[in-house]
Amino acid sequence: MIIEYDKKYDEQIKDSLVELQEHIQNIDLEGYNILTEEFRESYFSKTMDEIQKCNGKILLYKEENDIVGLVIGLINNDAEETYEFKAPKRGRITELIVSKNIRSNGIGTQLLNAMENYLKSIGCKDILLGAFAYNEKAIKFYEKNGYHVRMTDMTKTNL
């Protein structure tokens, strides 16, 4: 079941964030994503700061006493603050994580839909998210749920 963020789940949230980054590290062909000992606490702290700063929200998927998935959404209006044009109010999904041992059971779709509904309810007109290029399953998942590529980051390596 989907529940609102509760501080008592912080350690499980940290575990989920690390699990995602370990997955990214394993599929990163360039080997850029190297997790340090400080990563777990530092990434969680920065994530929580960003949630607070950007009127964000964490939704958790709970089975019994375990958090097996989460989604983080923020208000993303960087363009309004940076450039001389007016952009619609946008949401941004920064994390969508489902524990690897229970993926493909609809939990990711439920979390994504719940965050989309929340962002829509607070006036967001569209939602941005990023997916690591080598995470083909995630990209297919997002496309299946109506997302499309709007911008592509490119890298030149071995300079």
What is the role of each PLM region?
Residues 124, 143-152:
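Conserved acetyl-CoA-binding loop of GNAT-fold acetyltransferases
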Residues 45-60, 92:
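A short helix-loop-beta-strand connector motif used in the catalytic cores of GNAT acetyltransferases and
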Residues 60, 66-75, 92, 97:
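Conserved beta-strand in the GNAT
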Residues 114, 128-138, 155-159:
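Conserved beta-strand-loop-alpha-helix junction that forms the acyl-donor binding cleft
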Residues 1-28:
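A short beta-loop-alpha structural element at the N-terminal edge
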Residues 22-47:
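Conserved GNAT-fold acetyl-CoA-binding loop/helix
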Residues 84-100, 130, 152-155:
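Conserved acetyl-CoA binding element of GNAT-fold acetyltransferases
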Residues 95-98, 104-117, 121, 140-144:
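Conserved acetyl-CoA-binding loop-helix of GNAT-fold acetyltransferases
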